[in-house]
A protein has these predicted regions:
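Bacterial Sec-dependent N-terminal signal peptides
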Residues: 1-21, 304
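N-terminal cap/lid segment of alpha/beta-hydrolase-fold proteins
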Residues: 18-47
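Short substrate-entry loop that stabilizes the transition state in hydrolases
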Residues: 44-49, 55-95, 206-210
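Primarily recognizes the serine-hydrolase "nucleophile elbow" in alpha/beta-hydrolase
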Residues: 66, 121-193
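Cap/lid segment of the alpha/beta-hydrolase catalytic domain
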Residues: 87-110
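Alpha/beta-hydrolase active-site loop
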Residues: 103-128
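The feature captures the conserved acid-bearing segment of alpha/beta-hydrolase catalytic domains
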Residues: 164-241
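C-terminal catalytic histidine-bearing segment of alpha/beta-hydrolase fold enzymes
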Residues: 228, 232-304
Length: 304
């Protein structure tokens, strides 16, 4: 019995350490130094690895890349390379609320997306060094990180790029995972550039809309008013474009669910990634009842 227990402990310990982490500076100039933590399977792979790049949340003013460590370790233990990045927190020290300045909000999205492109560019240029399959680069993020990856995936980087020659012509990510994210314009997502996506979001989120609403539910006369299209709206748009899309709705839930699938139940994301890599087209909406009460205006039919 003692031998069995010891064996179980050793197996758990081995699994917990079945990946290696390396801290890398993926961009540096005279005023900026950006790092990432790369997690790779401990055992070298004979084939190129798919890569997930994770962007943390924090309202573009806070948060740390270390918050993505557990998610990245999980993916590394399942055969993926996975990186969590530091990025420019443009809103730090600025008013991001309804009475703030709208250009600062747009710039926050832009700087975040540009740093994501820089990290992606690093891996493309160093794909042999890290054994990365450049055709299988996924992106993911929570809250502000989700807004970063959504705009990074669908903005025209030739127009929005702050740096030269960041990504190859016609580059597309292999897929995207968004936790309580939103995008400024659904029209950015077209039949030509749409990619497989997984979303999870609380239906009563008042910080980032689940459907279509103003950011932070600001009034229309607010100086920082900006319409955003959240997970439910993007999901339906992707379905209309006949693309793979999965949505996990937490009925009655707020913004506290923005990191749920990164922190626990990570197998939902892993299954999505495997489906994409296997070339499967999946369209489904899963509803979780949280037991939380919401205002009638926030209740969707599938949450009743």
């Amino acid at each position: 019995m003692k031998k069995m227990l010891l064996l179980a402990i050793l197996l758990v310990a081995a699994f917990a350490n079945a990946q290696k982490m390396t801290t890398i500076t993926y961009f540096q100039n005279d005023t900026l130094k950006l790092d990432l933590d790369l997690f790779e399977p401990e055992t070298a792979s004979k084939t190129k690895l798919p890569l997930m790049i994770y962007v943390h949340g924090g309202g573009f003013s806070g948060g740390e890349r270390e918050s993505g460590h557990n998610f990245c370790k999980y993916l590394a233990n399942n055969g993926f390379a996975s990186a969590t990045i530091t990025y420019t927190l443009y809103a730090k020290g600025k008013n991001f609320g309804c009475d703030g300045a709208l250009p600062n909000k747009i710039k926050s999205f832009q700087f975040g997306a540009n740093d994501l492109w820089l990290a992606t560019s690093y891996f493309i240029k160093n794909s042999k060094k890290h054994n990365i399959d450049v055709d299988k680069i996924f992106v993911s993020g929570s809250s502000a990180g989700a807004e970063t990856v959504l705009h990074g995936a669908f903005w025209d980087f030739k127009t929005m790029n702050l740096y030269k020659n960041t990504l190859p012509k016609d580059f597309k990510y292999a897929g995207l995972v968004s936790g309580a994210g939103a995008i400024m314009d659904l029209n950015l997502i077209t039949k030509k550039n749409v990619i497989p996506m997984l979303f999870f979001h609380g239906s009563a989120d008042v910080t980032v809309p689940f459907g279509t609403a103003a950011h932070h539910l600001c009034k229309t006369n607010a100086s920082n008013w900006l319409m955003l299209f959240g997970s439910y709206s993007i999901y339906n748009h992707a379905i209309s474009l006949d693309e793979s899309a999965s949505l996990y709705t937490y009925c009655g839930g707020g913004h506290e669910y923005s990191g749920t699938l990164f922190e626990k139940d990570q197998f939902y994301i892993l299954n999505f990634l495997k489906e994409v890599l296997d070339g499967k087209k999946v369209k489904h909406h899963t509803v979780f009842k949280t037991g939380k009460k919401t205002d009638k205006e926030n209740i969707y039919g599938f949450c009743e």
